[in-house]
Amino acid sequence: MNIFALFETRVREALESLTRSGRLPEGLDLSRVVVEPPRDASHGDLATNAALVLAKEAKQNPKALGEALAEELRTDPRIVEASVAGPGFINLRLAPEVFQDVIRAALSEGENFGRGQMPGGPVNIEYVSANPTGPMHVGHGRGAVFGDALANLLAAAGRPVTREYYINDAGAQVDVLARSAYLRYREALGETITIPEGLYPGDYLKPVGMRLAETHGRALLDQPEHEWLPQVRRFAIDAMMAMIREDLAAIGIRHDVFFSEATLQGENGGKVAELLDALRQKGLVYEGRLPPPKGQLPDDWEDREQTLFRSSQFGDDVDRALLKSDGSFTYFASDIAYHRDKWLRGANELIDVLGADHGGYVKRMQAAVKAVSDGQARLDVKLCQLVRLLRAGEPVKMSKRAGEFVTLRDVIDEVGRDAIRFMMLYRKNDATLDFDLAKVVEQSKDNPVFYVQYGHARRFSVLRQAREALPGEDFSPAALLADADLSVLTDPGEIEMMRLIAQYPRVLESAAAAHEPHRIAFYLYETASSLHSFWNKGKDLPQLRIVNPTDRNSTRARLALVEALGGVLASGLAVLGVSAPNEMR
């Protein structure tokens, strides 16, 4: 039950009534009419901008139009007050029965409460896509958690979602990996090695070298590089991807598809060659020279005639090269082919979750997706800013020793999955995140993950108290739904909790539409806080205690309220991929 959608429909019906009576012209554009929470909760339960956004088109004074619309809305028994504020906003105060119906809906729908049928087709979300050249660091973790939570969020809103990881296994960096692993292989066979500059020095490749020695013995030593390199490269990539998958599993990150870059460039150029043919058929490829970039020239810029894609026709700043001087495909050409492949697999909305250093990538890829899909698909690129590791407010040194750094697994082992996931989502993705290893394990209000999980655990602690105080009573959601008298919930704290529960479907929907899972984290903190505040009031005022052995009526009503609120906390935590414990240990 979404009261915002419900009363938006009611506002539109009222506008239609005004049109039928001749007080509004026909054919008004209602697409910008919304119903949302008022900026100040003391003004009412809902607010609509209808009079403001329609006044100009209707050639009416917004305040006068607001008064006419408010008069029409007052005829609805579910609306106890409709008042015009400021330049024409209409604030609505709802009858208590509306919120009582919300609690009943939350109890009856359980984990499906708030989950919607968001319009739009299949979504493909690509996230993590860390190079398979070493362990994941904390920055990778932020993109991983953000992408996974966004996938959960869109699925909860009703969109079909494919979760994808792009394995960068065709670039020069995997040859560097292979040569580094080969040195560790020689070391495993007893040779003393020196790792030259430009290769990966980390100890994480020692086990790879040992497994190579176990698998191949000394056979690779007798082979020239062009023979051993592809074998070691595949072996090392598989070993790195196994390590990355283990790290992802440790924080609950999952993918449906692991897509290999190498598969794009198969026989005769594979899917990248197909892409160039498709772009040529559209007249979007030409031979030309690019002007020199402004400022300092990048190392890879060449003043020569090149094979170019007309990306500037689709919103990019300049056209882009598709072939290198040696005739091989550019990284950009491979990226376009990959995104075209996602679209051909059925996704009409593509989301890439990348590090903040990929800002220059956004316009060119959005232009490319528009071109290859004839405007049928859109690309949203979500950039995740840096993570600063702190301990009790002091910066943590990221490097442990030469070639080694603080890995994501190090942080998982220290603070656990839930703390990482919640805190990575407690800031907007494009804001730098300070992650304090000491604060995220505190048991206090200042630690959001503890505070929200404690709110959910309280749902079960009051249930245990009720069973002890009123033995033999049935406190299941079905029983509470059947006979709890919700009309006794009149305290401001109870009303606040009901309002917050009623907001959950809208929060879920708006967070999904904006691709912003942090909104769920903020909402959960506010909702858990409302329960904790009411609980604390009951410690001082016995008549407000949730469980009152001498007042069965209020006990059952408050347990119904807490059960509904706890269900919303569990649902929101599931979207974030954070556990909802029944008790805190």
UniProtKB/Swiss-Prot annotation:
Keyword Magnesium attributed: no
GO cellular component annotations of the record: cytoplasm
Keywords: Aminoacyl-tRNA synthetase, ATP-binding, Cytoplasm, Ligase, Nucleotide-binding, Protein biosynthesis
Enzyme class: ligase
Family matches, as CDD domains: ArgRS_core (cd00671)
Catalyzed reactions per annotation: tRNA(Arg) + L-arginine + ATP = L-arginyl-tRNA(Arg) + AMP + diphosphate
Catalytic activity, EC: 6.1.1.19
GO molecular function: arginine-tRNA ligase activity; ATP binding
Domain of life: Bacteria
Stored PANTHER family: ARGININE--TRNA LIGASE, CYTOPLASMIC, ARGINYL-TRNA SYNTHETASE
Quaternary structure annotation from Swiss-Prot or TrEMBL: Monomer.
Name under which the protein is recorded: Arginine--tRNA ligase
Protein source organism: Methylorubrum extorquens (strain CM4 / NCIMB 13688) (Methylobacterium extorquens)
